[in-house]
């Protein structure tokens, strides 16, 4: 049973599985290391797959056990009313401050893009 209330990658869904942040096929010595087992939802786990770094050795996904998230806002939302229904539409977007380290900024952007989080947040907000 996964003990966290929400997926550590998206923060929306209940975790139903564990992701091996470092793939167990490539790093069998870390296969059961608790810090390598990330409680996550099936959607994030399937989107992430076995990937964790680019061909240039840059990490693709945040690991909230190790990465220090900047203490500045980088996720924003715009609410708009476009018709007489009075139902707002939402538009989530990233705006990374120059004060955020370039490598971390790149990883944050990649994390949100690879997991399709901005679109998933919009879908979730419009339910």
Description of each model-found segment:
Residues 6-8, 16:
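Active-site-adjacent scaffolding segments
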Residues 84-127:
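Long, charge-rich alpha-helical interaction segments
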Residues 14-97:
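Glycine- and acidic-residue-rich phosphate-binding/metal-coordinating active-site segment common to enzymes
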């Amino acid at each position: 049973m996964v003990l966290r209330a929400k997926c550590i990658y998206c923060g929306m869904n209940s975790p139903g599985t564990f992701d091996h942040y470092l793939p167990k096929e490539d790093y069998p010595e870390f296969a059961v290391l608790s810090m390598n087992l990330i409680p996550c939802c099936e959607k994030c786990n399937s989107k992430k797959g076995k990937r964790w770094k680019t061909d240039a050795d840059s990490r693709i996904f945040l690991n909230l056990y190790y990465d220090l998230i900047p203490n500045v806002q980088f996720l924003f939302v715009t609410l708009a009313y476009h018709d007489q229904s009075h139902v707002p539409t939402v538009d989530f977007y990233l705006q990374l401050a120059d004060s955020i380290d370039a490598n971390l900024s790149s990883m944050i952007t990649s994390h949100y893009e690879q997991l399709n989080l901005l679109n998933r947040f919009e879908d979730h907000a419009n339910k």
